[in-house]
Amino acid sequence: MVNFKESLNNLPLIFTVIPLRDSKTGDPEHDNRIVKNIEARIMDISKTLSDFPGLTAINVPELVEENHEGKPRYNSIFTRKLARGIADQLGKEAIINKVVAHMESYDEFAKWILETESQGIRNIVLVGGNTRHHRYTGPNVSEANLITKHLMKTKNLSDITIGNICLPERGGEARRMLYKTISGADFFTTQMLFEGDHITHLLKEYGELCSKAQVNPATVILSFAPLKSVADLNLLDFLGVDLPDETKDYILENEQVSKAYKRSIKNALDVLKAIMNDKIDNYPEINIGINVEQLTKSNMPYSIEMLKEFHIMTKKK
């Protein structure tokens, strides 16, 4: 099994699986059905991904919506079981995401970290709240990084690889990334990318800030997802993903709607190539990775097509 932390300097390739959208009700029949659905999904996805030996890790996000007061509504369940199950079937490592903003106390967060580590999951993406306008009960991301490092030392935990999210379009993002790196981030996962201008500018600025601060930059994992139709736009809007008009027209407004996913894959490959070419001159010290996301359940075949193309590309490196 490839160690995920060790792979961070060698173009890691990740696949992100959408979690099961459900919640436990206390009804034994319903809750048992959830477990069976998880087990079936583990076997189905594992079989689908078995043809990609170059895959480094399986990532599963946590789906959380917030109301107008910032209170959470959890829309996913058994994310650790899903990630661990698929990873074990494939002989890969699991990555799990956790929204830390809604943790009620230090003890609650510490308990979650300890439980996650005890389940053999040592790669964690710590995620903040949706907006700066709410006063959240939990730690911010840098604080969560520091708490995790503290628990590793005081509880004698395995070496946990800490990830955070970066939003290329957000103002001041390079500075935030620097602070999160200093507080313990080993890697960043970007929001889904459909153009390269914002991320190349961000990587250049982040590299310069790290150099001035004498800090080794974290690996930045670039996220991509295929689009199959205009129906995907609502989800992108909900996720806050920027899809430039020119790119939207190219992928989705073409006469051959059935070929939208192919144009989407080509666009992603072109964006990655542009970033990698820019890296040579402007941020050679920053290691890059690739994350292919399953945007929806029906997009899975197209996500696999995209993964196949990136898999071929990484094998050539």
What are these regions (language model features)?
Residues 10-16, 55-59, 93-95, 122-125, ...:
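Structural preference for beta-strand elements that scaffold enzyme active sites
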Residues 2, 11, 70-97, 107, ...:
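Flavin-dependent oxidoreductase catalytic cores
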Residues 50-51, 117, 181-182:
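Non-catalytic positions within long, well-ordered alpha-helices that form the structural scaffold/packing
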Residues 38, 50-77, 129-139, 190-206, ...:
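Glycine-rich, proline-tolerant flexible connector loops at the mouths of alpha/beta enzymes
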Residues 1-7, 31-51, 125-131, 137-167, ...:
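Active-site pocket-lining/capping segments in soluble small-molecule metabolic enzymes
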Residues 16-23, 61-65, 97-102, 129-132, ...:
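Active-site beta-loop-alpha junctions enriched in small/polar residues
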Residues 32-41, 75-78, 101-115:
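Glycine-rich anion/phosphate-binding loops
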Residues 1-18, 22-35, 87:
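N-terminal amphipathic alpha-helix/helix-capping segment at the start of soluble metabolic enzymes
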